[in-house]
Amino acid sequence: MSKLMTLYMLFEALDEGRVQLDTRLPVSTKARQMQGSTMFLNENDRPTVEELIKGIIVLSGNDACIVVAEGLSGTEDAFARQMTERGRALGLTESTFVNASGWPAEGHVMSAHDLGILGLHLVQDFPEYYKFFALTEFPFDNRAPANRFNRNPLLDLGIGADGLKT
């Protein structure tokens, strides 16, 4: 769920004009080496911000989160500190971020209550980007065709679910 805070920070950067959807960001070795769910990025890639948004939402890309963090703040550590600060300003009093992806780490916590607050802020503060959360697949460069589908099983149940994260 930490990825939602990373997206909040990225949507804010878009609204402030610090990046655009077509801005390309470099991929570091740290991002390439990230484990878990990824976009399969490598150091030769320069994905656009829009591709990174889709990679985080649809593919749950941990590597994409690091690219965003480094692109906006220089380092993932600096970005995580900014996530916590911004979260406090939004009312997230029970969450502390130590990385951009939510990868298990000591001191990294997010409460269900704070998740609800953040979800509401995402929908209300950035309605123009909400459409990304309803995407059911993202075949990024056809790198892993079997990995292109959204990990949110609620999207395909026909119950009216239209997004955010699982």
Question: Model-found features: residue ranges?
Answer:
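Active-site SXXK
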Residues: M1-L25, L115
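Conserved catalytic neighborhood of penicillin-recognizing serine enzymes
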Residues: R32-C65, R148-L164
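Active-site catalytic microenvironments for nucleophilic, acid-base chemistry
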Residues: E12-E16, G71, H121
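Short, glycine/proline-biased beta-turn/loop segments that scaffold the active-site neighborhood
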Residues: E16-M39, A134-R143
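Penicillin-recognizing serine hydrolase domain
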Residues: T75-T166
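Surface-exposed aromatic
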Residues: R32-T38, I66-V67, S95-A105
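Active-site-proximal beta-strand/loop segments in catalytic clefts of secreted hydrolases
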Residues: S28-K30, I57-S60, V68-A69, V98-S101, ...
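Soluble non-cytosolic domains of exported or imported proteins
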Residues: M1-M5, E43-E51, G55-N62, S73-R81, ...
